[in-house]
Curated annotation (Swiss-Prot):
It comes from Geotalea uraniireducens (strain Rf4) (Geobacter uraniireducens). SUPFAM superfamilies: P-loop containing nucleoside triphosphate hydrolases (SSF52540). It catalyses: dTMP + ATP = dTDP + ADP. This is Thymidylate kinase. PANTHER family: THYMIDYLATE KINASE, UMP-CMP KINASE 2, MITOCHONDRIAL.
Length: 213
């Protein structure tokens, strides 16, 4: 069985950059690595992603949002994640179920029991072996996110960046509470530090977890 590692954090925390760096390092170490993301990761889930993140869809209700995430996740897990793990690969996933709890639970205020049920249904009980939480102040993350959006011609994936600072603070608080509740699964990394310092901290933690077998 492979190893399932997820990355979480507020907008602009640096997840995507760090996943690429870790994938390169693990590949050089001889691991077969799959890099994926949520929402998305496969054609059907990518179509849901386009709807979820399009800034033109601000009329979307929280419940619609939750159900679209669950549908995309169910397809992604069965089509991509589980087959890769069965093939003894390391799967690095940019967001997973914790994002739904943080964003739709803490951020939107949806019922935790409903979210837990849908997460369990969509994942068929699959849980990450390790979750890397890149934590940084909301203001720092949002500035990075908007710099990225403004630098990308025709960027449309900005619906969550347009939410209030208060919303993003609730999301961050949610992530930190999740990490507090499951310290054996989470590691918290300071996402406001430099890329190299962050990479070193993540690499050390991941290699230690892989060495556990």
């Amino acid at each position: 069985m492979g190893c399932f590692i997820t990355f979480e954090g507020v907008e602009g925390c640096g997840k995507t950059t760090q996943i690429k760096l870790l994938a390169q390092h693990l590949t050089e170490q001889g691991h077969t690595v799959i890099v994926t993301r949520e929402p998305g990761g496969c054609p059907i889930a990518d179509q849901a992603r386009a709807i979820l993140l399009d800034a033109d869809n601000r009329a979307m209700t929280p419940t619609t949002e939750l159900l679209l995430y669950a549908a995309a996740r169910a397809q992604h897990v069965q089509e991509i994640v589980k087959p890769a793990l069965a093939a003894n690969k390391v799967v690095l996933c940019d967001r997973f179920t914790d994002a739904t709890i943080a964003y739709q639970g803490y951020g939107r205020g949806l019922d935790p029991a409903t979210i837990a049920y849908l997460n369990d249904l969509a994942t068929d009980g699959l849980k990450p072996r390790l979750t890397v939480l890149l934590d940084c102040p909301v203001e720092v993350g949002l500035k990075r996110a908007f710099d990225r959006i403004n630098g990308a011609a025709g960027a449309r994936e900005e619906r969550f960046e347009l939410e209030s600072v208060l919303f993003h603070r609730k999301v961050r608080d949610g992530y930190l509470k999740l990490a507090e509740d499951e310290p054996e699964r989470f590691i918290i990394i300071d996402g406001s530090q430099g890329v190299q310092e962050t990479e070193a901290a993540i690499t050390a933690a991941v290699l230690a977890r892989l060495a556990e077998g």
